[in-house]
Amino acid sequence: MYSGLNTIWVLLGAALVFFMQAGFSMCEAGFTRAKNTGNILMKNLMDFCIGTPCFWLIGFGIMFGAGNSVIGWLDPGIVKDYGHILPSGVPLWAFAIFQTVFCATSATIVSGAMAERTKFSAYCIYSACISLLIYPISGHWIWGGGWLSQMGFHDFAGSTAVHMVGGVCALIGAKMLGPRIGKYGKDGRPRAILGHNLTFAALGVFILWFCWFGFNGASTVAMDSDAAVTSAGLIFFNTNLAAAVACCVTLIFTWIRYGKPDVSMTYNAALAGLVGITAGCDAVSPLGSAIMGAVFGVVIVLAVEFFDKVARIDDPVGAISVHGVCGALGTVMTGLFATGISTEKGLFYGGGFHFLGVQSLGVVSVAAYVAVIITIVFSILKKTIGLRVDAEEEIAGLDVTEHGLLTAYAGFAMSPDTITDDSTPVAVAGETPVAEAIPVKKVPAFTDGSPKFTKIEVICKEARLDALKNAMTAIGITGMTVSHVLGCGVQKGKPEYYRGIPVEATLLPKVQVDIVVSKVPVRTVVETAKKVLYTGHIGDGKIFVYDVENVVKVRTGEEGYAALQDD
């Protein structure tokens, strides 16, 4: 007898977990460069589309079949009886789609850590391998009646089964792939490669946070009893609390560590809290959830810094730290904070070391298994079709080289990519003999007694543009050209950080005002501009003065002073 309430609950959860693909897409696109956006979105689409038939044909049977404690059975198309594993009142196909979207989540985690330099063909193949074998076998150990579940291992919604599996694959993949071009200087120090759209990343975080209520909440797979309803309420509350506390702690920690609260790290902290609490959201109290969230908030920062600076593993989005490290840590910490309502009591609640030991064993076992299998997969790909694109393709961007897509932002001007490989030695200019030097011809600005033309170029803050225009009008300047530019000075100010790495050069928005004068004294223009722009702070601007040989008005053909006059 099926339960309509339970089935709707499971299907609603499946829909929410499916929509996490949109959240992952936005996060990964925002944390990476614009030239790879189309590739990122394509990968997140295809790992789901490839993973779905793979899990249907092979993965589901391996994961939930009643084979043995290590592996299920081979059941192409899901045609056998799964009554031994189905939740009460939930039909097979509802349970199957719920598990399919979980499998796709694990596969998509890898995309971010290997972004911007992976061959699309290789990505499609290893995504299939994750859905066919890697995720289902470890999932059988945990959720399919395998040896870990028989020992009492508790991973309620997948801190280890989903997230750590994806995180370990991401770790091995990013290590074997190598860092992006320009990520590390010749001295080995990491360089900040800024994400192109943190607005996208923020939207992705909110989508994921919203969908996580389905990811964790619907894992009760029931809502037809007081116990199930009570458990769902606790799960929702703990899920939200851990993420919120993690964000607050990361904000404070980065504020102290870097001098300012780090935006991208705080985004990562939200996901770290969600990932970490997933294993024990049904088993810990709100106090335990808050403490765990605080730990995740500190650990995520230290983990990102470790992989960037010590391990030198280039992870553009922090997937290894968020899903791998915090997924493992959250599973182990469940062995500390479990209150006994749905599992054994944790160490801090008088349960002793047994449950903590089981949790730790499960994490280590799954990590080791996944690391071995995915290393084999990546090694085969590397030796055959190749894992990484060529340097020229990487520099040009994967949108155009992998997909023939000129840009994902048609109609928008894109900022040039200024990160390059500085490992190639640069030729040092030496002295040239006088006999070989190019002759310098000095031409006087004016030779016929005509008026002198001078170009005055003013670089200033955008906020001072109106004041400058008004001041120029007041002294008789009626023509100017205004350009929006990016730039930075040579002065050394307070360092800025992106994901814990000092940003080498920050290009700030400025305006460039070009004025050509003849009768208005140059000194008057310069002094007026100085008076208007001066604040006494770094960044007031610069004024450049040039001689102009001639001026030509295109429409009339007039030259010299006449070309400067209004009609």
Show the residue positions of the predicted features:
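Glycine- and aromatic-enriched membrane alpha-helices
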Residues: 1-446
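Positively charged, small/polar-rich N-terminal and surface patches that mediate targeting and assembly
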Residues: 401-406, 419-567
